[in-house]
């Protein structure tokens, strides 16, 4: 899935999916994340925007209903706008702490101009800049970065991966429809860090948050089939691919 314009599709055959993504799966035990990553030095900050304080939510000890998930974390997910100098693109992203630390898909940013990215928060017309790219991996399709804002809402990170059949919720901006909410289950793990999900996602959802019933982020929504069959086959990367760099 992509920035609205160039949707990154997951290969149709399962064995190709595994071959493509298994190389960045965690090994058992406590070994380092084998995803090839790149650390990028700080950028010069261009803008120091002040924002109103947002309510910061903590992990729930009980299962939450879908409406509670969205009420708590809807404004922790944002739209990402990028450009290659000629074309404009749109994707999604989300905060994982209250000081602007955020996650999205690498392919949302790939090939775009440094310094041309902007973030739009729900209910806020201000355009926020990215001050630092901390880590990125094309193989595991994630990018970890810092947005020039603070006191933002965020989604706590899950300590455990969801099991097949567990309820999950996706928040993103498919086709520019800001902060669309959908629900489903984990359909299967196709590689150790790549899950198949039944929650609906589409162009522009790339980089959005996949959340469990306890209000914890478990994945980064990333891709879908596009073979004309209308099959509800969507994919998300486990949030575990980011954990070694936090």
Give residue spans per PLM region.
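C-terminal motif of bacterial Sec signal peptides marking the signal peptidase cleavage site
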Residues: 21-23
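Bacterial signal peptide processing site
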Residues: 25-27
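Catalytic nucleophile loop of clan PA
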Residues: 94-95, 186, 200-221
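N-terminal activation segment of mature serine protease catalytic domains
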Residues: 29-95, 101-106, 189, 245-246
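Active-site-proximal beta-strands of protease catalytic cores
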Residues: 77-79, 102-105, 161-174, 211-228, ...
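C-terminal cap/linker of serine protease catalytic domains
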Residues: 53, 57-69, 80, 116-118, ...
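Bacterial N-terminal signal peptides that target proteins for export
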Residues: 2-11
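Conserved active-site neighborhood of the chymotrypsin/trypsin-like protease fold
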Residues: 83-90, 97-180, 193-196
């Amino acid at each position: 899935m992509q920035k609205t314009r160039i949707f990154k599709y997951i290969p149709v055959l399962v064995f190709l999916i595994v071959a493509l993504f298994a190389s960045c799966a965690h090994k058992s035990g406590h070994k380092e994340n084998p995803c090839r990553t790149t650390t990028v030095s700080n950028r010069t900050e261009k803008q120091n925007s002040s924002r109103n304080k947002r309510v910061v939510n903590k992990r729930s000890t009980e299962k939450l209903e879908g409406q509670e998930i969205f009420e708590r974390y809807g404004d922790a997910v944002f739209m990402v706008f990028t450009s290659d100098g000629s074309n404009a693109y749109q994707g999604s992203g989300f905060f994982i702490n209250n000081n602007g630390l955020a996650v999205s898909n690498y392919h949302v940013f790939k090939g775009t101009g440094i310094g041309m990215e902007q973030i739009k928060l729900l209910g806020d017309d201000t355009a926020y800049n990215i001050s630092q790219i901390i880590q990125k991996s094309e193989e595991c399709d994630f990018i970890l970065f810092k947005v020039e804002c603070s006191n933002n809402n965020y989604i706590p990170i899950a300590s455990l991966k969801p099991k097949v059949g567990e309820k999950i919720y996706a928040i993103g901006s498919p086709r520019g429809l800001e902060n669309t909410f959908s629900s489903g289950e984990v359909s299967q793990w196709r590689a150790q860090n790549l899950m198949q999900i039944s929650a609906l996602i589409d162009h522009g959802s790339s980089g959005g948050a996949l959340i469990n019933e306890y209000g914890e982020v478990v994945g980064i929504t990333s891709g879908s089939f596009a073979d004309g069959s209308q099959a509800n086959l969507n994919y998300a990367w486990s949030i575990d691919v980011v954990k070694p760099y936090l």
